[in-house]
Curated annotation (Swiss-Prot):
Protein name, entry field: Zinc finger and BTB domain-containing protein 32
Ranges of biased composition (kind: Polar residues): 308-320
Lineage, top ranks: Eukaryota, Metazoa, Chordata, Craniata, Vertebrata
Coiled coil (UniProt feature): none
BTB domain location: 29-87
Length: 487
């Protein structure tokens, strides 16, 4: 009997950014993840919102252990889609979510398993409650108690390598202390030679030592490589704050190249830095990897700095980390801000002097059209005399234009022309052939085509008019007198 499928609803379906990215995918994807020979395009901004490990740009691959189908289900969950899977697929998906830092998917898998089993795995619960114990290989490397006083761990904090001594530290003048100091200086010298190493491996769930994946920048070029180095892993606190074990196949992804990111469609400048996640604090190793690629920006940043930022973000070198400008100290930032503000103030106050180009002045507005003719009744003004006379007929009620086809009368010629179109006729019609013409000049040209012998006696051009005008002669004292003053 087959069990019913399990449905995991995604909490990111209501996020507008995730919805937009899901509709655009695979367009504008700046991340290409290879899993088991299959490539999955994605947006680094969406991945960074759910996991600190996945929020990287470029092309990288996951190690063995995660199947392409499991990773496809994880991506669908991240992009706001509900995932339906069989009960046998729940545990691999939960392990993949735990290894890649997708806490929301891991919790959803826990709830789904709790609904079915009503209790969590006792072995995993015991492992979460008890702190991680060192393996036998690590105890062998520690050696006898006399060797425990030697430097045991080297951790990165804020981009510097600091030696942490176990229990008791030797005196300053002792040979052991001198050797430790010399070794620390050698480590710093090697780090200055662009050997940037950050362990991103994980300890296996069975307590055995896993394989460390190291990030290294080659001095001869910008290409990076992954080196597998066997040996004991660094303490869990230096890389991950959670004590939950992760399988050895959870190899961290690796950034190889950059592509145009999703920030461009949101009109936001690209940000290089640590991917954010609300439940996973930033660690020293991540600070070391990403510290050199943060771009200091201020509200009054100089134009050159913005140009450099845009150039660095828009044209990255394939196979290399995105290079930003050199970091500025607080004093340099303040000096550049003051210099830029002062230059703007100088240009604003002295536009006509040398060194500051004058601002282009807007073209002057055209002068207002004069209206010398005013109505003596309502005071309305007009630019042309015939406009004023036509308006005056509103007060007198005069309609001098009458239609020859019906009793319709109009106040002006344009209104009569519109009325004649309702009869399907033009203002002028030949009495011989019935052809209509839109203007008096065209009617005169049309009548020249007829023989004069065909015209009836006493014919005039006015006989072609389809309207009649009974405008009386204007008195000498016009009610609408021109005015010399303009408003």
């Amino acid at each position: 009997m087959s069990l019913p499928p399990i449905r995991l609803p995604s909490p990111y379906g209501s996020d507008r950014l995730v919805q937009l990215a899901a509709r655009l995918r695979p367009a504008l994807c700046d991340t290409l993840i290879t899993v088991g020979g299959q490539e999955f395009p994605a947006h680094s901004l969406v991945l960074a919102g759910v996991s600190q490990q996945l929020g990287r740009r470029g092309q990288w691959a996951l190690g063995e252990g995660i199947s392409p189908s499991t990773f496809a289900q994880l991506l669908n969950f991240v992009y706001g889609e509900s995932v339906e899977l069989q009960p046998r697929e729940l545990r691999p998906l939960q392990e993949a979510a735990r290894a890649l830092g997708v806490q929301s998917l891991e919790e959803a898998c826990w709830r789904a398993r709790g609904d079915r089993a009503k209790k969590p795995d006792p072995g995993l619960k015991k492992h979460q409650e008890e702190p991680e114990k060192p393996s036998r290989n690590a105890e062998r490397e520690l050696g006898d108690p006399g060797e425990k006083q030697k430097p045991e761990q080297v951790s990165r904090t804020g981009g510097r390598e600091q030696e942490m001594l176990h229990k008791h530290s030797p005196p300053r003048g002792s040979p052991e202390m001198a050797g430790a100091t010399q070794e620390a200086q050698q480590e710093q010298t090697r780090s200055k030679e662009k050997h940037l190493q950050a362990p991103v491996g994980q300890r296996g769930a069975d307590g055995k030592h896993g394989v460390l994946m190291w990030l290294r920048e080659n001095p001869g070029g910008s290409e990076e490589s992954l080196h597998k180095l066997p040996g004991p892993l660094p303490p869990a606190g230096s890389l991950q704050t959670s004590v939950t074990p992760r399988p050895s196949w959870a190899e961290a992804p690796w950034l190889v190249g950059g592509q145009p990111a999703l920030w461009s469609i949101l009109l936001m400048p690209p940000r290089y830095g640590i991917p954010f996640y609300h439940s996973t604090p930033t660690t020293g190793a991540w600070q070391e990897v990403w510290r050199e690629h943060r771009i200091p920006l201020s509200l009054n940043a100089p134009k050159g700095l913005w140009s450099q930022n845009q150039l660095a973000s828009s044209s990255p070198t394939p196979g290399s980390l995105p290079q930003g400008p050199a970091q500025l100290s607080p004093g340099e930032m303040e000096e550049s801000d003051q210099g830029h503000t002062g230059a703007l103030a100088t240009c604003a106050g002295h536009e006509d002097k040398a060194g500051c180009p004058p601002r282009p002045h807007p073209p002057p507005a055209p002068p207002a059209r004069s209206r010398p003719y005013a109505c003596s009744v309502c005071g309305k003004r007009f630019s042309l005399k015939h406009q004023m006379e036509t308006h005056y007929r509103v007060h007198t009620g005069e309609k001098p234009f009458s239609c020859s086809l019906c009793p319709q009368r109009s106040r002006d010629f344009s209104a009569m022309t519109k009325h004649l179109r309702t009869h399907g006729a033009a203002p002028y019609r030949x009495x011989l052939c019935g052809a209509g013409c839109p203007s008096l000049a065209s009617m005169q040209a049309h009548m020249r085509g007829h023989s004069p012998s065909q015209l009836p006696p006493g014919w005039t051009i006015r006989s072609t008019f389809l309207y009649s005008s009974s405008r009386p002669s204007r008195p000498s004292t016009s009610p609408c007198c021109p005015s010399s003053s303009t408003t």
